[in-house]
């Protein structure tokens, strides 16, 4: 995922100056790199420990599988094509993808029947209400911090003590990794972004780079307990306990931490593509 979401404040303004489009494009290269590294880790582990393999599929079987999943693959084309063609913004693309996924699930794959829709909507509403309650409190805390000028005071304090951008980014990574142990990703972004952004700007750190850095940290947080959402999803699929899965996931977690170090200190990994597309202006 490229991590193109933008946190909003109490009145709907962005908590940083980075747009959704900038963050979306800035996440493409880091996303491809991280996916490749995780894939390499998977292949290496499978080769080293001789994991069982499925029999090689024939071209007829591959074509059949491709034909069956073509409707799902079209979702990527609709989202990216619609954004690049200017048909809708990245935020609107999320709504379009939800409508498309609903249509495909009900009328094409028929995994979901019309009778199931009210139950699914009720479950989604319940989960959304819980998340929105958390986000509301996070936004209020962020608003209070901003209104009291605490970020600006912290920025001035750090500059007075000669803190450079490298030290600051190391601190940001530690802070976000610790927060990822006990909090949900959206809450962390809403609380920390308004505080960290003014300091980062004064230290010469591009807000888009900071945004991508936060997204990578959030992804790491989703892969370790106790709040790691990806662990619970994988546990349900693999029928493994959380403790057992936590031990098994360490090679991939280590890979993500190594990549986090790379993307932290090489800003061009995230800034090159949006700059090449003219989305960053003169920055």
Which positions does each model-derived feature cover?
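Alpha-helical transmembrane segments of multi-pass membrane transport proteins
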Residues: 1-283
């Amino acid at each position: 995922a490229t991590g193109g979401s933008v946190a909003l404040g109490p009145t709907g303004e962005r908590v940083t100056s980075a747009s959704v489009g900038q963050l979306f494009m800035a996440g493409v290269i880091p996303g491809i790199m991280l996916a490749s590294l995780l894939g390499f880790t998977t292949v290496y582990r499978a080769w080293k420990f001789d994991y069982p393999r499925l029999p090689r599929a024939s071209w007829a079987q591959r074509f059949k599988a491709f034909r069956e999943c073509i409707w799902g693959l079209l979702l990527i084309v609709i989202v990216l094509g619609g954004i690049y063609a200017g048909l809708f913004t990245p935020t609107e693309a999320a709504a379009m993808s939800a409508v498309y996924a609903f249509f495909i699930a009900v009328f094409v794959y028929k995994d979901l029947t019309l009778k199931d829709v009210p139950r699914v909507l009720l479950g989604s509403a319940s989960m959304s209400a819980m998340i929105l309650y958390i986000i509301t409190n996070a936004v209020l805390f962020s608003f209070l911090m901003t209104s009291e000028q605490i970020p600006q005071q912290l920025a001035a304090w750090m500059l007075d003590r000669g803190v450079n951008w490298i030290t600051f980014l190391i601190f940001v990574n530690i802070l976000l990794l610790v927060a990822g142990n006990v909090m949900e990703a959206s809450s962390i972004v809403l609380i920390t972004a308004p505080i960290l952004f003014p300091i980062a700007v004064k230290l010469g750190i591009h807000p888009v780079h900071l945004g991508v850095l936060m997204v990578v940290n959030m992804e790491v947080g989703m892969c370790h307990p106790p709040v790691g959402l990806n662990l619970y999803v994988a546990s349900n699929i693999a029928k493994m306990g959380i403790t057992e899965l936590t031990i098994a996931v360490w090679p991939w977690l280590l890979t993500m931490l190594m990549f986090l170090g790379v993307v932290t200190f090489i800003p061009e990994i995230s800034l090159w593509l949006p700059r090449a597309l003219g989305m960053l202006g003169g920055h």
